[in-house]
Amino acid sequence: MPVRPDLQQLEKCIDDALRKNDFKPLLALLQIDICEDVKIKCSKQFLRKLDDLICRELNKKDIQTVSSILISIGRCSKNIFILGQAGLQTMIKQGLVQKMVSWFENSKEIILNQQQSKDEAVMNMIEDLFDLLMVIYDISDEGKNQVLESFIPQICALVIDSRVNFCIQQEALKKMNLMLDRIPQDANKILSNQEMLTLMSNMGERILDVGDYELQVGIVEALCRMTTEKRRQELAYEWFSMDFIANAFKEIKDCEFETDCRIFLNLVNGILGDKRRVYTFPCLSAFLGKYELQIPSDEKLEEFWIDFNLGSHTLSFYIAGDEEDHQWEAVTVPEEKVQMYNIEVRESKKLLTLTLKNIVKISKKEGKELLFYFDESLEITNVTKKVFGGNKYKEFTRKQGISVAKTSIHVLFDASGSQILVPESQPSPVKENLIHLKEKSDIQKKLVNPLELGNSSSQDEITTPSRKKMSEASMIVPDTDRYTVRSPILLINTSTPRRSREPLQAINSVEKAVSKTSESGMDYAASPKSRQSDGRKRWNNRANHNKTTAVIQNKQYEDNESPDQNFNEIEDTLSNVSSAVGKVDKPVLPGVLDISKNTTHSRWACWTPVTTIKLCNNQRSRALPGDTCTQDTGVNKKCTKQKSVSDDDSEETQKGKYSKDVIKCNKSDEAEFCERNIQEQNHPKYSQKKNTANAKKSDWHIESETTYKSVLLNKTTEESLIYKKTCVLSKDVNTTICDKSPSRKSKRNHTKSRKELMSELTSCELEEIPVRENSKGKRFTGASESLINQISRRYNPSDSMMSTRKLKEPQDGSGFSKKPDLQFNKVQRKSYRKLKATVVNVTSECPLDDVYNFSLNGADEPVIKLGIQEFQATTREASMDNSLKLVKNHDEHDPFLKTKDKRMLSYEKKTLLSDTETECGCDDSKTDISWLKEPKTKRLMDYSRNKNTTKYKSRKSRSSMEKGQPRPTMVLNKNSMKNDYEVVVDGRTRLPRRATKTKKNYKDLSTSESESESEKECSYLFKDKLPTKEETIHSRAQTKKLPEKQQKVFNSEALKGQPSEEQKNSSRLREGREDSLCLSSASVSRSSSSVEVMRCTEKITERDFTQDYDYITKSLSPYPKAPSPEFLNGNNSVVGRGQSPRISETSAMCVRKSYSPASGPPFSPRHTPTKNNSVVNMKKANSVINNQRTQHCNSYSDVSSNSSEKLYMEPESPESCDNHMQNKREGNHAASPLSLSSEKIEKMWFDMPSENTHVSGPSQRGSKRRMYLEDDELSNSNEAEVEEAEEREHLLSKKRCQWENSDQHTFKTSLSTPDFSVPKDWQQELQGAGMFYDNISSDYKRKTDSQHKIMDDFTTKTLKLTQQHLMAMTSQAQGRRDENVEKFQVTLLDELEKVEKDSQTLRDLEKELVDIEEKLVQKMRAYHRCERERFRVLKTSLDKSFLVYNSVYEESVFTSEMCLMKANMKMLQDKLLKEMHEEEVLNIRRGLQSLFKAHEGNDA
């Protein structure tokens, strides 16, 4: 416990606070109870010290300290004495009131700085100041006069100032009215001066706009108290400009003040109309919980008035007080005390319910809810919202998600909290689209009929901007500013009439609802009317249906890659995609920041599987907290789902609609340009960009519209594709950086880097898009030009790279076509994986003359950028482009497949899953050629999320393969297989195939399904031998951000798997192989660390996508219908020879995907060897045997991709491990130059990779394959191998290319279907296998050795570098420690010196204490002596004065007095007796006389 300070030390406490800034004694003084009889003595300087202290603290704005000082003075004021006189009176004479005026003025400055903010500390300080003022006011008449004269004007000025908080003004008015109530008679003259008259007039004006009823009452009361009733009649007209108000004021009587004041103020507030700040409504009844509140008992009070104070944001009313003295009790409910309020109608009464945050007590009644019943006709809703805010309104509390409905509906809240339902395309301002919740439910009902909704809901309730109708009928409404702007825009997803999508899960208002697209491709939600909101920044040309939606972020439009993306694919596909893009672009809403891409998405989204969309939506909802772009993506994905559902049936219809919306382009590269141009035309800005792009280069890789759409879907899953390039650049750019680094190293990778750059540029463009259309258009143009330049640079490999890749240049284009598909598939997976940003760029530099001839489109390699992790997806885009080309050619060969392929291609473009699904596989020859030509281009595929991306992409690849009609991606993969080098380089795109193999059913991935099935078959065959490669691929899928070199290596490996066309172009393939080998070695080294991840991913992906892609292929892909039946029948189903090329293509795509950089990074060392083996196989693909082996490798890669996906999806099973071991053994035995059996050949292939591999590649590959097979074909592994051998022989006899494809199928089929047969001729085709094997083995060994050297060098340098850093770190740390020790030593010495000084001080004090002690002892002795002498004198005096003498004297006196008293008493006794005797004698005499007289009378 602290020492209790003496109350006499008040002045000392003030001194300590003033001089030492020590307030502890003063604060301790506040804890002491002060008795009334205690006197606190202070000096004359006390007031000066007090004033200095308070002024200093006020200048410092130390509110708490000032409040403590005022409380201390107030408590001790009556006990302070200065020079023996009352302290307060003395201080008043010294000028205390004047000093308090200065305190008040300083306090007012603080109050004005606070303005209307409510600061409890300031309010407490003002209250303490007024309390002290009232003490002074009551102390004496002099104090009253000074206070009235000094403070009444100050308080009036405070009340007039509108900047002061209402609570402070109310407190000041209360104190002033108390003063005026006890004003002396002679003080009225103080209130009669001109200054006060002016202030009173201003106070009268203040009544009109004060905004608080209590304050109004206080002002009226002050005016009445400051003037007499007679004078009030005169001044009323000066105070109020309107006569009827002045007359009403004059009617106020002091005896009826409360009721008269109510009448007056109701009149004043009512006259102001809408400008009034206080709304007063009569209340029928009021309750606090279950207790009813009574109206004050006053005859003149007719109503129970409730005041809604807009100025102070409070609700106030008066009730009957419990005590008889107080008939009126004021109750005020501030806004901060209200947790929620609700207004509803009950029994023809309007009930206002206020739910308070804490339990309150009113008139001894407690409760937490205040209930007010009003007449139903009173409009209190708006007023209540103005007082308590719209956010606390129970009915309109912001919802975290949208109610479930067939169509996604966004419920947005405007600033007032009102709900608004807005269709996706709705551009109208927030205020214009207010819709009640009931209307929301109605709209949801209307969504069942999209047409009706588009016509009625969009037009009647909400003015929707005119926008291009999309065959998908998907509307994308980017609402990135939804929360920031609180735009009441509700995205209405129109559901297709054919397939009503099950209710969407609740989507956060931040999330963008995905509009469902009808199979017919109609955008029902879009209304023909276009409406531009000036409040919201929109494109001026929104009315133009061809415009693409742009994402406005931070009031800036960001360029979307989709508008810029241009498909090199089939004309129909282009037209479909472009139309879809154009339509989707229109839906941009004024409040939406992020999506110009949405337009492209809608169609892509339609291609996206329904399951995928849901996943994207959910993921997106989680990722959406900040990204509206993600919302838009979600919308696109939903559309994609719808479209994918109706993919097979309405594909053609949608395509036709797209073509209607978008100008159709030729099948040539110009078609791609046209498509992009159409997209640009759809959006003026895009049109500008298109023109620039076309002028710059007709062959520059344009982002595929479809690809972009699928990217948007992916973006929906994560976050918006171009959310200020925060998402895209953060992940995609990072991926791009990873990819770019390899691309810079090799021009081959240059394509991938270019694609990445395209995605980056696109994201940048999206960010940079100005809010205004003109600026945005310019930026689109600039962005498109830059993209074109970047793409052209990437497609133009360096001279050194050109030597090896020029031959493959056309193949590279097709390789990119394949890549895009793979990337596209990956993109969809990424969307499942919640990819934050996905950019899909599809570019083609070579014509699309031959579906399988990528040489035609070698330069036109579609680039698909998956912005989630990297723009490596760009490589896939290239693959996609090639695949699209292949599909186109294949469609030419097979009209049915062509039509479906086109639809699927458009879908694939949108979905990014259709790359492998395109039916280019029909033309084996073309596929072979395209594969051979395309391999040069490296695929930029980014799988930011390995697991999801891998699954999803693999799924698509498999589906396309199974169908035997690989989608553009499939074709690209085939071509890549044939173009061993480049396609394998694009192997990253293979990763989606692995994912396709995984057993996830994505209905929209129909194309992917066929591819994935084909991949499965091939992967099964190769799985035993190439599991390692699959793992490698899968690991890449996980890593997703492999450098371009690795990606190229994988792509080249995949291309190796395509021997038929490679045999034709053996020389070019060899060159490509060399390049790919170099890349593969690099990628192997890099990806080796991620092998285990790949395995898990493979497993998981394999399972999920194996199941899902089949389902998806059946449901969505029209292509799979022809070849898919075989694939769809089961992974074990046998694929026909005609389908074998497709299968091989699919396998190739799978291989690409497996080799995709995304899968590459996760590779473990064993995966790396597989990768190298693939590369070696690619190199040897130049020869027929090489081509065949390359085909096997491709099949293996497909299998490996699938198995890698499987590994990713599920842990390796013992069976898979066993199969793997068997495969390794078989592969090792198969190392023999030629083998009569297909099994032996496969073994040779795998053995060769194993030899080239650092680790036993064949066994590793086999294990991967086994992993993939373990679900479907572990039991049939031997039969599968036999069948594989047979099928290989048969396919080789038919056609090496077809044979390779069939081999892939055979592998896959053998794994999946033991009943597949292979021709006996097959062995004859492999006569050159030994030579091919030797070449591959030597090349691979050389590469392996070089890699080992590089790794050794890297290890040595790393060790040295690490040692250097460790030494530097150690030295720095030691130096730091030494410095700290020295500092500590210095500090320690200083403290020791101080200790010595303190010790000396203590010794001196001790001496002083000894001296003092001696003096005290002497003084005490002297005192004792004096005391003893005093006692002696007193005793002597006492003895002399009393004792014997007194007793004797008193005894004599007593005796004499007693004798005298006795004598006197005897004399008195004698006298009395004598008188008594005489009286008796007299009485007897009288009696005798009367007796004698009576006797004498009788006798007479």
Curated annotation (Swiss-Prot):
Changes after translation: Phosphorylated.
Q: Where is this region: Disordered?
A: 512-548, 796-820, 940-1010, 1029-1084, 1208-1234
What is any one GO biological process for this UniProt entry? male meiotic nuclear division
Upon gene disruption, the observed phenotype is: Mice appear healthy, but males are completely sterile, due to defective meiotic chromosome synapsis during spermatocyte development. Testes weight is much reduced in mutant mice. Females display reduced fertility.
Q: Where is the composition biased (Basic and acidic residues)?
A: 977-989, 1059-1076, 1217-1228
Keywords of the record: Cell cycle, Cell division, Chromosome, Coiled coil, DNA-binding, Meiosis, Nucleus, Phosphoprotein
Phosphothreonine-modified residues are 464, 496, 608, 633, 916, 1168, 1313
One Pfam match:
SYCP2_ARLD
Give start-end positions of Basic residues composition bias.
Answer: 948-958, 990-1000
Location in or out of the cell? Nucleus; Chromosome
Question: Per its UniProt entry, which superkingdom is the organism in?
Answer: Eukaryota
Entry-annotated residues carrying Phosphoserine: 457-458, 487, 500, 509, 518, 527, 646, 650, 741, 914, 1115, 1117, 1124, 1133, 1140, 1144, 1156, 1159, 1164, 1183, 1213, 1216, 1232, 1275, 1277
Which InterPro entries is this protein grouped with?
A: SYCP2-like, SYCP2_ARLD, SYCP2_SLD
Q: In which tissues is it expressed?
A: Detected in testis and spermatocytes (at protein level).
Q: Mainly localized where? A: nucleus
Is Secreted included in the keywords of this UniProt record?
Answer: no
Alphabetized GO MF terms = DNA binding
Q: Which residues form a coiled coil?
A: 1388-1429
Family that this chain belongs to: Belongs to the SYCP2 family.
Please explain the role this protein plays, according to its UniProt record: Major component of the axial/lateral elements of synaptonemal complexes (SCS) during meiotic prophase. Plays a role in the assembly of synaptonemal complexes. Required for normal meiotic chromosome synapsis during oocyte and spermatocyte development and for normal male and female fertility. Required for insertion of SYCP3 into synaptonemal complexes. May be involved in the organization of chromatin by temporarily binding to DNA scaffold attachment regions. Requires SYCP3, but not SYCP1, in order to be incorporated into the axial/lateral elements.
> Its quaternary structure?
Component of the lateral elements of synaptonemal complexes. Heterodimer with SYCP3. Interacts with SMC1A and SMC3. Interacts with TEX11.
Its protein name is: Synaptonemal complex protein 2
The gene designation is: Sycp2
